[in-house]
Amino acid sequence: MEFHHVSVLLNECIENLNIKPDGVYVDCTMGGAGHSKEIVKKLSDKGLFIGFDQDKNAISTAKERLSEYESRVKFVHSNFENIKEELEKIGVYKIDGVLADLGVSSHQLDEADRGFSYMQDAPLDMRMDVRCEFSAYDVVNTYTEDELTKIIKDYGEDNWAKRIAKFIVEERANKPIETTGELVDVIKKAIPKKARIVGPHPAKRTFQAIRIEVNNELGVITKMINDASSIMNEGGRICIITFHSLEDRIVKNAFKHLASDCICPQHLPICQCDKESEVKIITRKPILPSEEEIEVNPRSRSAKLRVAEKI
């Protein structure tokens, strides 16, 4: 299947990366290489681009799409939480910019057998990296009712979390829930008809929650930002695109922590932590897509871009 993904906030990202022709730049979520190609085009033969992705299909597609720039490009098949370790493996110890687009690519959503979409029936999977064994099937069929309630509430921000979890546990007592279609049916039964009439698809929030849990999406964000900052040259920038409030809050807080000086409790008269500010925040408020972009690519509607610069 053709790996198709419309890059979100493309011009805004490239502009905010402040790309130097001979710099070293990392795309943590290469996907279809839309952002990546624009970065690579701005590099000279002395520059270097490193693209990360945990989806082997994305790596294959990116290699094709960036083949004309082969001499200045390297690929890493890994989760971006390993950014520091993986870069060290290829002899890269300092970088000049990092980009991460935290959305699920439209390719993954559209490829039915990956199990990301609530619009198509498929095995319950949702693994970004198919080398991992843990899948959506395990979450849906082995988590306790309390555990399901917690992730649907925390990661999906769904008001019906408790009821959805209860219905899932009751349904799987008869037989395992094996497909996305079966899960959607359970969710629809759990949410009262009146509540289903308004708002997004009733399964949207639960699917988001399970996907985040399967791929530990929130757990890896802060580590990646901290590690990227630790190897960033002065003036280098970290650009992160998020798609829901949980991710955005994590990025905002990670930037805030890196930008702050002393973090000692207020009652201490003298600083004990010796923490110094590592970055300055470029975007006090996130950059949002234009109305024109939303019209062309409705999936960009919830995107937010935050930027920090190493000092």
From Swiss-Prot:
Entry-linked SUPFAM superfamilies: Putative methyltransferase TM0872, insert domain (SSF81799), S-adenosyl-L-methionine-dependent methyltransferases (SSF53335)
One annotated GO molecular function: rRNA (cytosine-N4-)-methyltransferase activity
Catalytic activity reported: cytidine(1402) in 16S rRNA + S-adenosyl-L-methionine = N(4)-methylcytidine(1402) in 16S rRNA + S-adenosyl-L-homocysteine + H(+)
Positions bound to S-adenosyl-L-methionine: 33-35, 53, 80, 101, 108
Function: Specifically methylates the N4 position of cytidine in position 1402 (C1402) of 16S rRNA.
Database matches in NCBIfam families: 16S rRNA (cytosine(1402)-N(4))-methyltransferase RsmH
Entry protein name: Ribosomal RNA small subunit methyltransferase H
Lineage of origin: Bacteria, Bacillati, Bacillota, Clostridia, Peptostreptococcales
